[in-house]
């Protein structure tokens, strides 16, 4: 639920749940102080009549409200890759051993470098090459292949191409990227080399939703590790890869559990 803040909202919503004989398992709420916007996430079990429940919410909540009733079910993702294996490999292993509750429907690459890795896990791999194509032409072919699998989310696991605005608009707040720096520092390419040149003492990674601006989408998860003057750019890169794969999988856990609200180009995690 997302709506203008008002007195007694939690009581009103929970009373509707009680009226429908639904048991509240977990409840989290937050008020954004500047805009007085109320956010609430409630986990329920019981026998649902979606239409009447949503109608009751509509007539109870203030004007300008939005709300969704989401079944607890396994999500589907399509992963996009280029040549780097660490983030993809981590997701494949976690998924295989039950550490990440998701269906990896397919992996799509603009190179075939990671095809053999993916096929070891009996997951389809598709090559959608960008050779001799404009960015718009390539992204159109990419979207067509993605849509064959009807994924809930698209994951950029070190996919090293910038997506065009039309592609991004097709999947609003459904494309998750891992960026190899602690944004907003060192956006774009070769962040570890620039971090080394700057003499930074921490390096990090950022998982975010993709929007029209390069590396400017709503941030879902970040983390850092300490480094010092003894680290070369290559050593920073190796250490950074560990942070990248951890941050990406943690962000996906939140997204797949429907815990992430997007508001004003930032996220609220409940």
Predicted features, each with a name:
Residues 6-26:
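Short amphipathic alpha-helix segments
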Residues 30-270:
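One-carbon transfer enzymes
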């Amino acid at each position: 639920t997302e709506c203008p803040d008002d007195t007694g909202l939690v009581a009103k919503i929970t009373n509707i749940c009680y009226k429908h004989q639904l048991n509240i398992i977990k409840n989290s709420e937050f008020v954004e102080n500047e805009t007085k916007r109320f956010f609430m996430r409630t986990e329920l079990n019981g026998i649902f009549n979606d239409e009447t429940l949503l109608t009751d919410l509509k007539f109870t909540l203030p004007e300008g409200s939005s709300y969704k009733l989401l079944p607890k079910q396994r999500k589907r993702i399509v992963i996009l890759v280029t040549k780097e294996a660490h983030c993809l490999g981590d997701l494949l292993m976690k998924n295989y051993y039950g550490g990440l509750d998701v269906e990896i429907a397919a992996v799509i690459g603009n190179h075939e470098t990671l095809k053999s890795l993916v096929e070891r896990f009996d997951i389809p791999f598709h090559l959608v090459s960008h050779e001799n194509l404009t960015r718009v032409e390539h992204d159109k072919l990419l979207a067509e292949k993605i849509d064959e699998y009807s994924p809930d989310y698209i994951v950029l696991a070190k996919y090293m191409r910038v997506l065009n605005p039309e592609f991004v608009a097709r999947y609003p707040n459904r494309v998750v990227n891992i960026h190899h720096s602690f944004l907003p520092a060192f956006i774009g390419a070769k962040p570890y080399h620039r971090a080394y040149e700057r003499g930074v003492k921490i390096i990090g990674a950022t998982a975010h939703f993709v929007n029209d601006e390069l590396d400017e989408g709503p941030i879902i998860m970040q983390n850092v590790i300490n480094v010092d003057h003894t680290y070369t750019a290559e050593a920073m890169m190796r250490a950074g890869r560990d942070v990248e794969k951890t941050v990406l999988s943690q962000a996906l856990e939140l997204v797949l559990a429907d815990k992430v609200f997007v508001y004003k180009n930032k996220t609220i995690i409940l």
